[in-house]
Amino acid sequence: GEKLQPNIMQLLKKGSEAVREASKDSGKDIKIAVHYTNIENNSEVYDRAEDLKNAKVDYDVFGLSFYTFWDGTYENMQRVAKTLRENYGTDVMIAETSYAYTSEDGDGQGNSFVGTDDIVEGYPATVQSQATVVRDVCAAANEVGAIGVFYWGGTWIPVGKATDDNSAIWEKFGSGWASSYCADYDPDDGGLYYGGCAWDN
Protein backbone atom coordinates (compact mmCIF):
# COMPACT_ATOMS: atom_id res chain seq x y z
CA GLY A 1 0.00 0.00 0.00
CA GLU A 2 0.94 3.64 -0.43
CA LYS A 3 2.50 5.24 2.66
CA LEU A 4 3.51 8.75 1.60
CA GLN A 5 0.81 11.34 2.29
CA PRO A 6 1.20 13.29 -0.99
CA ASN A 7 0.71 10.06 -2.95
CA ILE A 8 -2.21 9.01 -0.76
CA MET A 9 -3.84 12.38 -1.42
CA GLN A 10 -3.45 11.88 -5.17
CA LEU A 11 -5.12 8.48 -4.93
CA LEU A 12 -7.97 9.98 -2.91
CA LYS A 13 -8.41 12.77 -5.45
CA LYS A 14 -8.66 10.28 -8.30
CA GLY A 15 -11.11 8.16 -6.33
CA SER A 16 -13.19 11.23 -5.55
CA GLU A 17 -13.24 12.27 -9.20
CA ALA A 18 -14.45 8.80 -10.17
CA VAL A 19 -17.28 8.93 -7.62
CA ARG A 20 -18.39 12.37 -8.79
CA GLU A 21 -18.43 11.12 -12.37
CA ALA A 22 -20.43 8.02 -11.42
CA SER A 23 -22.80 10.21 -9.42
CA LYS A 24 -23.40 12.44 -12.41
CA ASP A 25 -23.81 9.53 -14.84
CA SER A 26 -26.30 7.76 -12.58
CA GLY A 27 -28.26 10.85 -11.64
CA LYS A 28 -27.79 9.98 -7.97
CA ASP A 29 -26.33 12.13 -5.22
CA ILE A 30 -23.51 9.87 -4.03
CA LYS A 31 -21.70 11.15 -0.96
CA ILE A 32 -17.94 10.74 -0.65
CA ALA A 33 -16.53 9.79 2.73
CA VAL A 34 -12.97 9.54 3.97
CA HIS A 35 -12.36 7.41 7.05
CA TYR A 36 -9.63 7.70 9.67
CA THR A 37 -8.79 5.85 12.87
CA ASN A 38 -6.80 6.58 16.03
CA ILE A 39 -8.84 9.60 17.08
CA GLU A 40 -7.32 9.47 20.55
CA ASN A 41 -4.40 11.24 18.83
CA ASN A 42 -6.21 14.47 17.95
CA SER A 43 -3.27 16.09 16.19
CA GLU A 44 -2.92 13.16 13.79
CA VAL A 45 -6.58 13.44 12.78
CA TYR A 46 -6.27 17.19 12.29
CA ASP A 47 -3.10 16.65 10.25
CA ARG A 48 -5.05 14.35 7.92
CA ALA A 49 -7.81 16.96 7.62
CA GLU A 50 -5.17 19.57 6.74
CA ASP A 51 -3.66 17.22 4.16
CA LEU A 52 -7.08 16.77 2.55
CA LYS A 53 -7.68 20.52 2.55
CA ASN A 54 -4.26 21.41 1.14
CA ALA A 55 -4.50 18.74 -1.55
CA LYS A 56 -8.02 19.96 -2.43
CA VAL A 57 -9.51 16.48 -2.06
CA ASP A 58 -13.24 16.69 -2.78
CA TYR A 59 -15.26 14.86 -0.12
CA ASP A 60 -18.48 15.27 1.85
CA VAL A 61 -18.08 13.32 5.07
CA PHE A 62 -15.18 12.76 7.45
CA GLY A 63 -15.62 9.30 8.97
CA LEU A 64 -14.07 8.44 12.33
CA SER A 65 -13.50 5.12 14.03
CA PHE A 66 -14.48 5.26 17.69
CA TYR A 67 -14.07 2.32 20.03
CA THR A 68 -14.56 3.13 23.71
CA PHE A 69 -11.83 0.65 24.66
CA TRP A 70 -9.20 2.01 22.26
CA ASP A 71 -9.99 5.56 21.23
CA GLY A 72 -10.39 7.58 24.38
CA THR A 73 -13.41 9.22 25.93
CA TYR A 74 -16.76 10.26 24.52
CA GLU A 75 -15.73 13.85 25.22
CA ASN A 76 -12.61 13.49 23.08
CA MET A 77 -14.62 11.96 20.23
CA GLN A 78 -17.06 14.86 20.45
CA ARG A 79 -14.23 17.40 20.50
CA VAL A 80 -12.65 15.88 17.37
CA ALA A 81 -15.99 15.69 15.53
CA LYS A 82 -16.90 19.26 16.45
CA THR A 83 -13.48 20.60 15.43
CA LEU A 84 -13.69 18.87 12.05
CA ARG A 85 -17.19 20.26 11.42
CA GLU A 86 -16.32 23.79 12.48
CA ASN A 87 -12.80 24.12 11.07
CA TYR A 88 -13.17 22.15 7.84
CA GLY A 89 -16.85 22.55 6.98
CA THR A 90 -17.39 18.82 6.59
CA ASP A 91 -20.09 16.50 7.82
CA VAL A 92 -18.82 13.94 10.32
CA MET A 93 -19.94 10.39 11.06
CA ILE A 94 -18.77 7.56 13.27
CA ALA A 95 -17.82 5.13 10.53
CA GLU A 96 -17.20 2.24 12.89
CA THR A 97 -17.86 1.36 16.50
CA SER A 98 -18.58 -1.77 18.50
CA TYR A 99 -18.18 -3.43 21.86
CA ALA A 100 -17.80 -7.01 22.99
CA TYR A 101 -20.62 -9.06 24.48
CA THR A 102 -18.15 -11.60 25.89
CA SER A 103 -14.45 -11.94 26.53
CA GLU A 104 -14.52 -15.68 25.81
CA ASP A 105 -12.67 -17.13 22.83
CA GLY A 106 -14.88 -18.80 20.24
CA ASP A 107 -12.62 -20.19 17.54
CA GLY A 108 -9.19 -20.92 18.98
CA GLN A 109 -7.67 -17.74 17.54
CA GLY A 110 -6.78 -14.52 19.32
CA ASN A 111 -9.38 -11.79 19.77
CA SER A 112 -9.06 -8.06 19.22
CA PHE A 113 -10.93 -7.43 22.48
CA VAL A 114 -8.93 -9.24 25.12
CA GLY A 115 -10.60 -9.79 28.44
CA THR A 116 -10.30 -7.39 31.33
CA ASP A 117 -7.62 -5.26 29.62
CA ASP A 118 -10.18 -3.83 27.20
CA ILE A 119 -13.27 -3.65 29.40
CA VAL A 120 -14.35 -0.03 29.88
CA GLU A 121 -15.50 0.97 33.36
CA GLY A 122 -19.27 0.72 33.58
CA TYR A 123 -19.51 -1.61 30.58
CA PRO A 124 -18.87 -5.26 31.47
CA ALA A 125 -18.55 -7.62 28.49
CA THR A 126 -22.25 -8.52 28.25
CA VAL A 127 -24.99 -8.37 25.64
CA GLN A 128 -26.61 -5.48 27.52
CA SER A 129 -23.34 -3.52 27.68
CA GLN A 130 -22.83 -4.02 23.96
CA ALA A 131 -26.26 -2.50 23.34
CA THR A 132 -25.64 0.29 25.86
CA VAL A 133 -22.31 1.26 24.30
CA VAL A 134 -23.88 1.52 20.85
CA ARG A 135 -26.69 3.66 22.25
CA ASP A 136 -24.24 5.89 24.15
CA VAL A 137 -22.00 6.33 21.10
CA CYS A 138 -25.05 7.30 19.01
CA ALA A 139 -26.19 9.81 21.64
CA ALA A 140 -22.73 11.38 22.03
CA ALA A 141 -22.27 11.64 18.25
CA ASN A 142 -25.73 13.15 17.82
CA GLU A 143 -24.98 15.82 20.43
CA VAL A 144 -22.25 17.28 18.21
CA GLY A 145 -24.13 16.97 14.92
CA ALA A 146 -22.66 13.77 13.49
CA ILE A 147 -24.82 12.55 10.62
CA GLY A 148 -24.72 8.87 11.56
CA VAL A 149 -23.09 5.92 13.29
CA PHE A 150 -22.17 2.56 11.77
CA TYR A 151 -21.81 -0.59 13.83
CA TRP A 152 -18.70 -2.49 12.78
CA GLY A 153 -18.27 -6.21 12.33
CA GLY A 154 -21.77 -7.41 13.12
CA THR A 155 -21.07 -10.58 11.14
CA TRP A 156 -17.80 -11.32 12.90
CA ILE A 157 -18.96 -14.23 14.97
CA PRO A 158 -17.09 -17.49 15.55
CA VAL A 159 -17.98 -20.59 13.58
CA GLY A 160 -16.13 -23.07 15.73
CA LYS A 161 -12.48 -23.96 16.07
CA ALA A 162 -10.23 -22.89 13.21
CA THR A 163 -9.33 -26.00 11.27
CA ASP A 164 -7.73 -26.70 7.92
CA ASP A 165 -11.23 -27.37 6.57
CA ASN A 166 -12.41 -23.93 7.65
CA SER A 167 -9.28 -22.28 6.25
CA ALA A 168 -9.87 -23.83 2.83
CA ILE A 169 -13.47 -22.59 2.81
CA TRP A 170 -12.46 -19.09 3.91
CA GLU A 171 -9.72 -18.97 1.30
CA LYS A 172 -12.21 -19.86 -1.44
CA PHE A 173 -15.24 -17.85 -0.36
CA GLY A 174 -13.73 -15.07 1.72
CA SER A 175 -13.76 -14.19 5.38
CA GLY A 176 -12.93 -11.41 7.81
CA TRP A 177 -9.31 -12.45 8.06
CA ALA A 178 -6.34 -11.70 5.84
CA SER A 179 -6.58 -14.28 3.04
CA SER A 180 -3.72 -14.84 0.60
CA TYR A 181 -5.41 -12.51 -1.91
CA CYS A 182 -4.22 -9.48 0.04
CA ALA A 183 -0.56 -10.54 -0.13
CA ASP A 184 0.33 -7.88 -2.73
CA TYR A 185 -1.12 -5.19 -0.49
CA ASP A 186 -0.23 -6.68 2.90
CA PRO A 187 2.60 -9.21 2.45
CA ASP A 188 3.29 -9.43 6.18
CA ASP A 189 -0.17 -10.78 7.01
CA GLY A 190 -1.79 -12.12 3.83
CA GLY A 191 -2.88 -15.70 4.45
CA LEU A 192 -0.37 -16.14 7.23
CA TYR A 193 -2.40 -15.90 10.43
CA TYR A 194 -5.86 -15.60 11.91
CA GLY A 195 -7.38 -18.72 10.46
CA GLY A 196 -10.41 -17.79 12.49
CA CYS A 197 -11.77 -14.38 13.24
CA ALA A 198 -9.76 -11.71 15.00
CA TRP A 199 -13.00 -10.33 16.37
CA ASP A 200 -15.43 -12.98 17.44
CA ASN A 201 -16.95 -11.31 20.47
Write out the residue ranges for each language-model feature.
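Active-site cleft segment of glycoside hydrolase catalytic domains centered on the general acid/base Glu
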Residues: 1-51, 57, 72-79, 166-170
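Hydrophobic, Leu/Ile/Phe/Ala-enriched alpha-helical segments that form helix-helix packing faces
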Residues: 15-23, 52, 84, 134-141
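Short, well-ordered coil/turn segments that N-cap beta-strands
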Residues: 26-31, 57-60, 88-91, 145-147
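Active-site beta-loop-alpha junctions enriched in small/polar residues
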Residues: 35-40, 64-69, 97-100, 152-156
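Flexible, glycine-rich surface segments
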Residues: 49-106
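Aromatic-rich peripheral "rim/lid" segments of glycoside hydrolase catalytic domains that contact
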Residues: 79, 83-86, 102-115, 119, ...
